[in-house]
Swiss-Prot record:
Binding-site residues for ADP, renumbered to this chain: T13, R17, T266, G309, G410, N414
Annotated EC: 2.7.1.30
Alphabetical UniProt keywords: ATP-binding, Glycerol metabolism, Kinase, Nucleotide-binding, Transferase
One Gene Ontology CC term in the entry: cytosol
Described function: Key enzyme in the regulation of glycerol uptake and metabolism. Catalyzes the phosphorylation of glycerol to yield sn-glycerol 3-phosphate.
Residues involved in sn-glycerol 3-phosphate binding: T13, R83, E84, Y135, D244
Species of provenance: Shewanella halifaxensis (strain HAW-EB4)
Gene it is expressed from: glpK
Activity regulation comment: Inhibited by fructose 1,6-bisphosphate (FBP).
Biological classification of the source: Bacteria, Pseudomonadati, Pseudomonadota, Gammaproteobacteria, Alteromonadales
Protein name: Glycerol kinase
Any Pfam family matching the protein: FGGY_C
Residues annotated as binding ATP: T13, T14, S15, T266, G309, Q313, G410
């Protein structure tokens, strides 16, 4: 095999990374660069799309240098990205007309409220699988068209293009040759009908968005074009892409119906593959596309918790109870239980399955005997309880009782948390050998598209489990603890 490597570009909310993998899925080299966060008004979040491009393109070049390899050694590049973040740029010059509006940005809430008054809430959920919320790209696009001078007119003349970050990067990498996205990213725009696999004319009309600015939707594993970024004569295929959470699902090889993964980052993202059926949630979850490849689309249920690792950051930065996130395992293990204490980290409201923006955080059950260790333990347990909330909602929606969940993200190194997660959900928790599952998913998609790997069966042989955690408490104890959590949550709403 002359081409021995795959490169994954992992474009996240705070940094851009490039990772070089070999055929055995070993990480050969990596490079990471942070970029600026802009908060022009309360609730507004922006990125400079050109800075994202500069950070991502430079990490690609540096990762190649660190691996001491040349472009001709690389079989393909795969891309995974922060989802929903919105860029509109000039087709001729390649310059954005405005900063990228980030997924966290809430500025388009009034547009969402207007759509609700038009009676479109149920239609949005049925067609796109999403909630009518500023989180998604559609209302961000409308905001730029309506509020930046001259942009709507230029868009209607066909002079401008829209893309989520995957689309923007592919367009730049291919020097404007490819204006494409994949089904996972398209499904997060609130403009894509996940059943017909087409941009939805009803929603485009409701938001007054010209169809001409939207990218072509291609499979998640396919060759979209080639890049010469690493020098004249280079010609690397851009061959796979997926939004970050779907890439992690694929990287964990959750490719069959009923398989699920939980990513523990700042928040928690639990996704469950529901196969070829788009399950409409009745319990506060999103219906989204898991992957679109080989002429088939798989769907997923998705639940997100706002405060996962961020709860531990709060213990460290605001309360000063710990110096390092890793210390939580030591302190939590020094006590038998939380002494009846529950921490509900509803600092910015509650996410799925509650979707209560007005809920606020609370420490419930404090007595004179409660100490620092109990509170630290309660913070870790809160992450697991919230994941149990999501798992229960998924079981009700999918009518599938999960027996196993795969985990990734920074917090999975915490053995106490992983064991308690297994205990409170009564599910086996599997921690993989390789925790870079998001980048790995992008690499897998690209490698499969160009024949670097033959099949997902081959990939399964390379995927190892570093440790499995199995339930160690009684059903009675589990039910009692979870009832206490539910009672505590009720007091925050």
């Amino acid at each position: 095999m002359s081409k021995k490597y795959i490169i994954a570009l992992d474009q996240g909310t705070t940094s851009s990374r490039a990772i070089v993998f070999d055929h055995s899925t070993n990480m050969v080299a990596s490079c990471q660069r942070e970029f600026s966060q802009m908060y022009p008004k309360p609730g507004w979040v922006e990125h400079d799309a050109m800075e994202i491009w500069a950070s991502q393109s430079s990490t690609l070049i540096e990762a190649l240098a660190r691996a001491d390899i040349h472009s001709e050694d690389v079989a393909a590049i795969g891309i995974t990205n922060q989802r929903e973040t919105t860029v509109i740029w000039d087709k001729a010059t390649g310059k954005p007309v405005y900063n990228a509006i980030v997924w966290q940005c809430r500025r388009s809430k009034a547009i969402c409220d207007e759509l609700k008054t038009q009676g479109l809430e149920d239609y949005v959920k049925q067609a796109t699988g999403l909630l009518l919320d500023p989180y998604f790209s559609g209302t961000k696009i409308k905001w730029i068209l309506d509020n930046v001078d001259g942009v709507r007119e230029r868009a209607e003349k066909g002079e401008l293009l829209f893309g989520t970050i995957d689309t923007w990067l592919v367009w730049k990498l291919t020097e404007g040759q490819a204006h494409v996205t994949d089904p996972t990213n398209a499904s997060r725009t609130m403009l894509f009908n996940i059943h017909t696999q087409e941009w939805d004319e009803t929603l485009l009309k409701a938001l007054n968005i010209p169809r001409s600015i939207l990218p072509e939707v291609k499979p998640s594993s396919a060759v979209y074009g080639h890049t010469r970024i690493v020098g004249e004569g280079s010609h690397i295929a851009i061959a796979g892409m997926a939004g970050d959470q779907q890439a992690a699902l694929f990287g964990q090889l959750c490719i069959e119906e009923g398989m699920a993964k939980n990513t523990y980052g700042t928040g928690c993202f639990l996704l469950m593959n529901t196969g070829t059926e788009a399950v409409q949630s009745q319990h506060g979850l999103l219906t989204t596309i898991a992957i679109g490849a080989n002429g088939e689309v798989n769907y997923a249920l998705e639940g997100s918790v706002f405060m996962g690792g961020a709860t531990v950051q709060w213990l460290r930065d605001e309360l000063g109870l710990i110096r390092d996130a890793q210390d939580t395992e030591y302190f939590a293990s020094k006590v038998e239980d939380t002494h009846g204490v529950y921490l509900i980290p509803a600092f910015v409201g509650l996410g799925a399955p509650y979707w209560d923006p007005d809920a606020r955080g609370a420490l419930v059950g404090l007595t004179r005997g409660a100490n620092r260790n109990h509170i630290i333990r309660a913070a870790l347990e809160a992450i697991a309880y919230q994941s149990r909330d999501l798992l229960d909602a998924m079981a009700k929606d999918s009518r599938v009782e999960l027996k196993q969940i795969k985990v990734d993200g920074g917090a999975v190194a915490n053995d106490f948390l992983m064991q308690f997660q297994s205990d409170i959900t009564n599910v086996e928790v599997q921690r993989p050998d390789l925790t870079e599952t998001t980048a790995m998913g992008a690499a897998f998609l690209a490698g499969l598209a160009v024949g670097f790997w033959d099949s997902t069966d081959e990939l399964k042989l390379k995927a190892g489990v570093e440790r499995s955690f199995t339930p160690q408490i009684t059903a009675q104890k589990r039910d009692s603890l979870y009832q206490g959590w539910q009672n505590a949550v009720a007091r925050t709403r």
